[in-house]
Swiss-Prot record:
Residues 327-340 have a biased composition (Low complexity). This is Protein NDRG1-B. Pfam families: Ndr. GO terms for cellular component: cytoplasm. Belongs to the NDRG family. Residues 326-396 are annotated as: Disordered.
């Protein structure tokens, strides 16, 4: 890991100006950052709105993991050059879980922190009070769980989801026991570190881990963090099921991109989640040389996958594709993911698979903003030789 990887910038990002004034005029809206404390039925939530929402397209809404806030979780990604093309087309709404934002005061004694279900039910109020048309969710860990619950309860508000390290299951009794034992032996920050990073990462990338350890120790209110962690550890099972024709199963209705690093502590949970979603609307992206923080360690891959994802939804038809496009003639690394399958095979950097819109088989025709097709990439075409459709699994 190079030294630059751990030199993290947590300042609010701004899109880079284009080289041509014409490009600026066409693509860049005035980039305004506004912070809001929004009152909801389950308490106040702090949000940061970047850019002015456009009436004919959704807003990217982010939700961070435990031990983080929106800056330390996502600024490395949004400050990355390849993401600037996306932020020229979409406004971004960053949501901080209650009490996790910078400078948050401690909750009073006896305060009942919202459950994970209640945190999800805060989001309709955010969308409505900010006057947003709809959202594309980007969440990691606990934030991915919250956004998924929100999408299940309010499908009309969510056009798509990018879920990093999603765990759809309630905490098992063995996990509960491990948490209790860890709580006796280690401080809260170490418990959070074990959630964010695998043991391999702790040893192979100590600088990055130490950067976030210091952030958790000094920048996050410890009392509030403990409440958030307790809420996440008390989560319910999402109870999603892979849809069967003719049945009334609970599953996501929107296109979904599941992302996980090959050494992430959440890799098995993400594969299991993939097995429970609609295979015609879901893509699983496994990243090599990456652990629990793909948005920090592999921002180029994640930005490129995000571009493909929104293109598959009918947005940004002229977006430039670089890294993954150049490898379009390489071997396709897509394989079917089935229940119980825990394959962790990955292609090398020179054999990257198409991340979202399978270039050879997928239509990229798009209509204007007012009449866009919201269909996801046609994953049925990839496995048309099978009787049962299977979700796309991609390694890069």
């Amino acid at each position: 890991m190079s030294a630059e990887m751990t030199d993290l910038n947590f300042a609010e990002g701004r899109p880079l100006m284009g080289e041509k004034e014409d490009d600026i005029t066409v693509l860049l809206q005035e980039y305004v950052t506004q912070e809001h404390d929004i009152e909801t039925a389950h308490g106040i939530v702090h949000v940061t709105m970047c850019g002015t929402p456009k009436l004919n397209r959704p807003v990217i809404l982010t939700y961070h993991d435990i031990g983080l806030n929106h800056k330390t979780c996502f600024n490395s990604l949004f400050n990355f050059e390849d993401m600037h093309e996306i932020t020229q087309h979409f406004s971004v709404c960053h949501v901080d879980a209650p009490g996790q934002q910078e400078g948050a005061a401690s909750f009073p004694a006896g305060y009942m922190y919202p459950s994970m279900d209640q945190l999800a039910e805060m989001l309709p109020g955010v969308v409505q009070q900010l006057g947003l048309k709809s959202i594309i969710g980007l969440g990691i860990g606990s934030g991915a769980y919250i956004l998924t619950r929100f999408a299940l309860n309010h499908p009309s508000m969510v056009e798509g989801l990018v879920l990093i390290n999603i765990n759809p299951c309630a905490e098992g009794w063995m996990d509960w026991a491990a948490t209790k034992i860890s709580g006796w032996a280690h401080a809260l920050p170490e418990m959070v570190i074990s959630h964010l990073f695998s043991k391999d990462e702790v040893h192979s990338n100590p600088e990055l881990v130490e950067t976030y350890r210091q952030h958790i120790l000094h920048d996050i209110n410890q009392n509030n963090l403990q409440l958030f962690v307790k809420s996440y550890n008390s989560r319910r099972d999402l109870e999603i099921e892979r849809p069967i024709p003719g049945s009334n199963t609970v599953t996501l209705k929107c296109p979904s991109l599941l992302v996980v690093g090959d050494s992430s502590p959440a890799v098995d949970a993400v594969v299991e989640c993939n097995s429970k979603l609609d295979p015609t609307k879901t893509t699983l992206l496994k990243m090599s040389d990456c652990g629990g923080f793909p948005q920090v360690v592999q921002p180029a891959k994640l930005a490129e996958a995000f571009k493909y994802f929104v293109q598959g939804m009918g947005y940004m038809p002229a977006a430039s594709m670089t890294r993954l496009m150049r490898s379009r003639t390489g071997s396709a690394a897509s394989s079917s993911s089935q229940d119980g399958n825990r394959s962790r095979s990955h292609t090398n950097e020179g054999s990257r698979s198409r991340s979202q819109t399978g270039d050879g088989n997928r239509s990229r025709a798009h209509t204007g903003d007012g009449n866009r097709s919201r269909s996801h990439t046609d994953t049925n075409n990839v496995n048309s030789d099978h009787n049962t459709p299977k979700s796309m699994e991609v390694s890069c």
